[in-house]
Amino acid sequence: PNGKVLGVEHLRKVVEWARARDVVVASDECYLGLGWTEQPVSILDPRVCDGDFTNLLAIHSLSKTSNMASYRTGWFAGDADLIAELVSVRRHMGLMMPGPIQHATIAALNDDSHEAEQKQRYCDRREILHDALVAAGFRIDDSEGGLYLWATRGEDCWQTVDWLAERGILVAPGSFYGPKGAQHVRVCL
């Protein structure tokens, strides 16, 4: 929830740990194109997995980088055997993507310029919001990537939620994301 970007060495350790236990790693990489201070790295990057995709799944979507939230269009990459199992299950669930969404997906995948434009839009919002929060006495932690700022004033998150709500600003309390978020709020760009 905080936008922290895991580096190559950290991800290598995750892969090594999982392989030692024959565990699947499913990496949500929907924000991969939205790094700000750090460039996110895929679990499938050769520096992370040495080119071996066994038990690794990278999950991608167009919802963030292409502004196609709720279209439910995305894909898996990685271990071919795991993907074959997922395709088999999906085939029997009767799920079908409507034709217009298929066409929108194809258009998005064939055009990289809109992603750069969308990223710039988010970057501009992030800069304005970051500066406004800091001016209001907040500290921004992590927030190296993604569409959120992880902000704190050093108080209980619910006090911050109330303070911001009084000013017409809606945020998510950090406690929604676990005890480590008790003094943070998640602010959407």
Predicted stretch roles:
Residues 1-189:
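PLP-dependent class I/II
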